[in-house]
């Protein structure tokens, strides 16, 4: 039995096949051979095409399969990804614009406005951070500057959520995903709708959130036809690179710190 690991970076997409019994990596692939392009239409902007990530996920899986490994042996899928990127999808699940990724700084002032408007102490108590340049602020930028795009958004999500959607057909996120978007209220242990409300983001645009560790989605028949992964395979892990870093280092208790 094998577990398939997918990592969506900003420079490459890495795919690994892990042997569950031994815990060893049976095969891995990183694509492309050179770095993925990052678009910068203006100074301080950084964008990538979500379809490019998916293309390299498929290429990586096929590269491993070509080495003689059967995707039919895969019994679970885990996804890690570059954090904070904004992916906007229409009702057909198509990206409406390039993803505004983690290193894009266009929404800094919007986040600063929200911090003062909502209240500095309230934000730090409930979201443990400033709205800053995180995903919700990036979406607020789209609302202000690209109203035609904003009007077509059915759901917005993170890079890892998009790959999970392409594998499963289900639009969802995780609680840790909401946290990195500044849409999780740690004080109340629920979604931070006050942030979405401040930004004018309709609640129905936010995908349903589940756990990072546990089955939140399963691969569908389309993924089986395209990649050979059996339909119904659980996507049992999904988290951004920093939660994944903390988990890998066993930084799990209050007061512990993982630095990168």
Language-model features and meaning:
Residues 1-97, 152, 207-208, 224-225, ...:
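N-terminal glycine/serine-rich phosphate-binding loop of ATP-dependent small-molecule kinases
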Residues 8-10, 122-240:
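Gly/Ser/Thr-rich active-site cleft segment
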Residues 18-19, 87-90, 142-144, 165-166, ...:
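Short beta-strand-to-turn element immediately C-terminal to the catalytic PLP-Schiff-base lysine
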Residues 30-31, 100-101, 177:
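Residue-level structural signal for beta-strand termini and adjacent loop
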Residues 54-62, 136-139, 240-243:
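Short, hydrophobic/amphipathic alpha-helical packing segments
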Residues 104:
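Carbohydrate-associated surface elements
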Residues 109-113, 245-247:
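Pocket-flanking alpha-helical
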Residues 225, 233-260:
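Catalytic phosphate/nucleotide-handling subdomain of diverse soluble enzymes
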């Amino acid at each position: 039995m094998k577990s398939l690991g997918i990592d969506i970076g900003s420079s490459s997409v890495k795919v690994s096949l892990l042997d569950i019994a031994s815990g060893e990596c049976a095969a891995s692939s990183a694509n492309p051979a050179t770095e993925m392009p990052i678009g910068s239409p203006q100074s301080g902007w950084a964008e990538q095409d979500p379809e490019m990530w998916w293309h390299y996920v498929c290429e990586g899986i096929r590269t491993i399969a070509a080495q003689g490994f059967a995707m039919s042996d895969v019994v679970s899928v885990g996804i890690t990804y570059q954090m904070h990127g904004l992916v906007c999808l229409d009702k057909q699940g198509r990206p409406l614009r390039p993803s505004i990724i983690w290193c894009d700084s266009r929404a800094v002032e919007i986040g600063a406005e929200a911090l003062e408007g909502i209240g500095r102490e309230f934000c730090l108590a409930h979201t443990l951070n400033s709205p800053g340049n995180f995903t919700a602020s990036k979406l607020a930028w789209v609302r202000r500057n690209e109203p035609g795009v904003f009007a077509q958004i059915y759901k917005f999500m993170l890079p890892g959520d998009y790959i999970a959607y392409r594998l499963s057909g289900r639009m969802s996120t995780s609680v840790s995903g909401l946290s990195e978007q500044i849409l999780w209220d740690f004080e109340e242990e629920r979604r931070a709708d006050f942030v979405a409300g401040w930004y004018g983001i309709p609640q129905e645009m936010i995908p349903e959130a589940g756990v990072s560790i546990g089955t939140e989605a399963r691969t569908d028949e389309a993924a089986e036809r395209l990649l050979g992964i059996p339909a119904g395979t659980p996507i049992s892990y999904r988290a951004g690179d920093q939660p994944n870093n903390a988990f890998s280092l066993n930084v799990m208790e209050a007061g512990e710190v993982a630095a990168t």
